[in-house]
Regions:
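C-terminal helical subdomain
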Residues: 199-200, 218-293
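Conserved glycine-rich cofactor-binding loop
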Residues: 15-16
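Catalytic loop of short-chain dehydrogenase/reductase
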Residues: 107-111, 119-124, 128, 154-192, ...
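Active-site loop of short-chain dehydrogenase/reductase
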Residues: 6-7, 69-70, 97-98, 112, ...
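The beta1-alpha1 cofactor-binding region of Rossmann-like NAD(H)/NADP(H)-dependent oxidoreductases
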Residues: 54-55, 75-87
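Conserved glycine-rich Rossmann-like NAD(P)H-binding loop of the short-chain dehydrogenase/reductase
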Residues: 29-59
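A short, exposed helix-loop element centered on a Lys and neighboring polar residues
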Residues: 140-141, 184
Length: 293
């Protein structure tokens, strides 16, 4: 069965980037959208890759309100397990259920896109694993009993082709590969309870950061970006997935966002089909069904 209307949805990392785009593309009138991030107040900016990016949950919340959704801007440090636990306790107390989680937070270091071997980048590149992998586990851990109790739910892990090809170095690759396998293993545990866990490779997303970075790149990179998806596209795809009466068939799978969107007949906001990068960056491989307890 498809997930109910007037959903309670939790989206992490929604102050900017993919998380913000997911929230804007996903929200429907009547939905309660709990958005988390470290930057709350409108007008807040962060520095990344030498760029200044606007980053605030209040800005995302304003846009969601215009759609008719009910946004809850919740300032959260996902390195703090107790804060994560209190968030889930608040959701349970206030709403009594949690229909969908979209894990899109990621702690990105400025060295990420430098063309250097890992030992010449900062050792703090490993923070990608702390927020983006470990954080997904902790939030899912505390939210699982609520979703199991209601016997339905959807957990989405925003992942990447970096799980299969060399991309940005071993810390990034470990995070994405770990995320895909963790999503599969969660799906195994959730199977009796009608809760799906799915990893989605987002591909190139034309968010605030990508568009600014492209101004300093060569023509090849700029051409590569032309097939990218809008910031909102992932949200449109996840919304269609949540409305699918048989969404459980995808539980445990690793899916390419653009291919899933095409299967649902979804066009991007400009009427285009974003490009799948399977042919150049590789595609997902199914995990074995064997279970060892």
């Amino acid at each position: 069965m498809a997930l109910k209307k007037n959903r309670v949805i939790l989206i992490t990392g929604a102050s900017r980037g993919v998380g913000k785009g997911v929230a804007l593309g996903f929200a429907r009138k009547g939905d309660t959208i709990i958005i988390t991030g470290r930057s709350l107040v409108k007008g807040t900016s962060v520095s990344q890759f030498g760029l200044t990016l606007e980053s605030s949950l209040e800005s995302t919340a304003e846009a969601l309100s215009k759609i008719g959704a009910h946004p809850i801007a919740y300032q959260l440090d996902q390195n703090n397990d107790e804060e994560v636990k209190r968030l889930v306790e608040m959701i349970s107390s206030e709403y009594g259920r949690l229909d969908i989680i979209v894990h899109s937070s990621c702690q990105i270091h400025d060295d990420l896109v430098k063309p250097l071997p890992f030992w010449k980048k900062s050792i703090n590149m490993w923070s990608l694993v702390d927020v983006g992998l470990r954080s997904n586990y902790i939030l899912s851990y505390y939210a699982a009993p609520l979703m199991v109790k209601q016997k339905e739910g959807l957990i989405i892990h925003i992942s990447s082709h970096g799980a299969r090809c060399y991309m940005h170095g071993p810390a990034y690759g470990a995070q994405k590969a770990g995320m895909d396998k963790m999503s599969f293993d969660m799906a195994c545990d959730f199977e009796p309870y009608n809760v799906a866990s799915i990893a989605l490779w987002s591909g190139i997303v034309l968010d605030e950061k990508t568009e600014l970075v492209s101004k300093n790149q060569d023509d090849t990179y700029v051409e590569f970006l032309k097939g990218g998806a809008s910031q909102q596209y992932a949200g449109l795809v996840i919304d269609s997935l949540s409305q699918d009466s048989d969404y459980m068939r995808y539980s445990g799978k690793v899916l390419i966002m653009q291919e899933l969107g095409e299967s649902y007949g979804i066009k991007d906001i400009e009427g285009k089909n974003p490009r799948s990068d399977r042919s150049t960056l590789g595609g997902p491989v199914d995990f074995e069904s064997t279970k060892v307890y």
